[in-house]
């Protein structure tokens, strides 16, 4: 899988297919969006909102949630606002989000089955 991706990337760069995607690091619409990492949203969300490359800062995680006051999501939003000119933040959820139905004990069992030590999970 990795070699296939790297080969595609080499050809992409050699053909200069990146040129139509070039933009600045500053979002044209001065907008940041926090949303879920669900693969169904990859192209659907920007299309549904009429967004183009370079217009927004898109921050994604499982469930599109802020879990910690100084975690990665807040850090990303702070950088967007304080350094990149973002003036508005949208938090966008979606229907049938898998994170909503996840149970911590089931996740814990999956981690144990993969060899994660129980004492690590109790920290």
Model-predicted regions and their roles:
Residues 37-40, 95-99:
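Gly/Ser/Thr-rich loops at beta-strand to alpha-helix junctions
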Residues 34-36, 60, 92-94:
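Short beta-strand segments
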Residues 25-40:
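N-terminal low-complexity or amphipathic/hydrophobic leaders
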Residues 42-45, 100-102:
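Short glycine-/acidic-enriched loop or helix-start segments at secondary-structure transitions
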Residues 1-29, 64-73, 82-86, 97-123:
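Divalent-metal-activated hydrolytic enzyme cores
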Residues 53-64:
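Glycine/charged-rich beta-loop-alpha catalytic/anionic-binding loops adjacent to active sites
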Residues 46-52:
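Short Gly/aromatic-enriched secondary-structure transition segments
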């Amino acid at each position: 899988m990795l070699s296939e991706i790297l080969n595609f990337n080499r050809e992409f760069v050699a053909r200069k297919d990146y040129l139509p995607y070039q933009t600045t690091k500053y979002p044209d619409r001065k907008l940041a969006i926090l949303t879920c990492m669900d693969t169904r949203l990859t192209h659907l969300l920007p299309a549904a909102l009429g967004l183009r490359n370079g217009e927004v800062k898109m921050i994604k995680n499982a469930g599109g949630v802020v879990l910690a006051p100084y975690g990665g999501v807040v850090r990303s939003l702070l950088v967007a606002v304080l350094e990149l000119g973002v003036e508005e933040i949208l938090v966008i959820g979606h229907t049938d989000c898998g994170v909503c139905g996840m149970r911590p004990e089931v996740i814990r069992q999956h981690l144990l089955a993969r060899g994660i030590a129980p004492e690590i999970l109790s920290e």
